């Protein structure tokens, strides 16, 4: 079984804001050091950014308002310098920014199918949504906000879902219509890694960090290689190291970072990566 959330889930909104700030940092310099945490809910967005790259607070606020679709949200933004020891460690060449353990695995047919369904629903209804698929029992659970409760003009959405997904045993909005979003639920960075990474394992979060952070670069690299090889790969690294051990064999961290950079650029940046994670429509 697998659970997927869409880009309007509050946790994904937090991830997307964090990703947008990383994108802003990369516009300022080629190799920024960034670690962003976001907590959002009930008309307030708190952000702490540990970084060596000064961002214009107006750009930060604009990104928050754009992603939340809320021009009145209160933004509490705090930017602090990265720890000097961590910053100095990266001065000569890119090295692992922290200790980490990782496992990349091939995406399963179940994960691909649910992600396809979630993406198609989101194209039709771009509001907060969460979905579960269990192919063993052919069961599909859809919790989609703002689509009616059976007594409104919006019930055509239900009809469309039932027509479109006839081969699944479906439950749609089991307690009726709901409105979702950050006024109903709070969101925080890196709380939906199961949705983002499937059966993969990571010691840290995927979002809100620059590519020197192994939590970003190694997770992306192992995901790509697992798809290529059709099998799982395990890795570990330690802070300050220029190698990552993948299935016991040392690999150059700089090359891993460049492969991850190409992946992020191809997908459209860190904010785009945060929309669906590594398993995307």
Where are these regions (language model features)?
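A domain-level signal for the structural core that forms small-molecule/cofactor-binding pockets
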Residues: 1-281
């Amino acid at each position: 079984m697998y659970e997927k959330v869409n880009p309007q889930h509050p946790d994904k909104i937090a991830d997307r804001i964090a990703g947008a700030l990383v994108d802003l940092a990369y516009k300022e310099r080629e190799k920024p050091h960034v670690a962003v945490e976001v907590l959002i809910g009930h008309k307030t967005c708190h952000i702490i950014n540990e970084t060596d790259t000064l961002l214009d607070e107006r750009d930060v606020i604009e990104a928050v308002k754009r992603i939340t679709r809320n021009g009145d949200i209160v933004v509490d933004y705090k930017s602090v310098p990265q720890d000097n020891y961590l910053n100095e460690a990266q001065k000569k060449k890119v090295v692992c920014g922290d200790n980490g353990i990782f496992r990349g695995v091939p995406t399963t047919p179940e994960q691909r199918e649910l992600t396809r369904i979630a993406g198609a629903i989101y194209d039709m209804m771009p509001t907060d949504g969460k979905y579960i698929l269990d192919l063993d029992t052919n069961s599909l659970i859809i919790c989609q906000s703002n689509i009616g409760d059976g007594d409104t003009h919006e019930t055509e959405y239900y009809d469309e879902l039932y027509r479109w997904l006839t081969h699944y045993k479906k439950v749609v909005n089991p307690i009726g219509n709901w409105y979702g979003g950050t006024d109903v639920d709070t969101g925080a960075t890196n709380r939906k890694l199961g949705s983002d990474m499937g059966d993969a394992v990571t010691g840290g979060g995927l979002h809100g960090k620059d590519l020197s952070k192994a939590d970003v670069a190694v997770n992306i690299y192992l995901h790509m290689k697992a798809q290529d090889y059709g099998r799982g790969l395990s890795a570990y690294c330690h802070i300050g190291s220029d190698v990552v051990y993948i299935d016991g064999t040392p690999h150059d961290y700089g090359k891993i970072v460049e492969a991850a950079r190409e992946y992020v650029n191809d997908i459209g940046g860190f904010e785009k990566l945060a929309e669906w994670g590594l398993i995307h429509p």
